[in-house]
Amino acid sequence: MKRRFLVEFRLQGAACNGFTYDVSPSGIFVRSARLPTPGTFLTAKLHLPEGKRIEVRGRVIRSFRVSAALSRLIPSGFSIRLSDSPEEYYQLFMAS
């Protein structure tokens, strides 16, 4: 499901952010200039409508950067396979 939420995460101690490009009950694709290495375990905070924030955790399974020429067609970013998500996350899919 295509949904755009602000995503905050940390890489090597640095605060980073991106936006969801695609979300599903089992994972998230995040568009971001900062790309974690596949295999990295990541905690991310999603900013939902009405000021709600939820924290999800998972392992990065894919990470890639496209050339500037393709960036309007194909997003650079990474995929997280979720392993720990609150009930509020799953409610996003029941509402749609």
Language model regions located:
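Structured alpha-helical
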Residues: 1-96
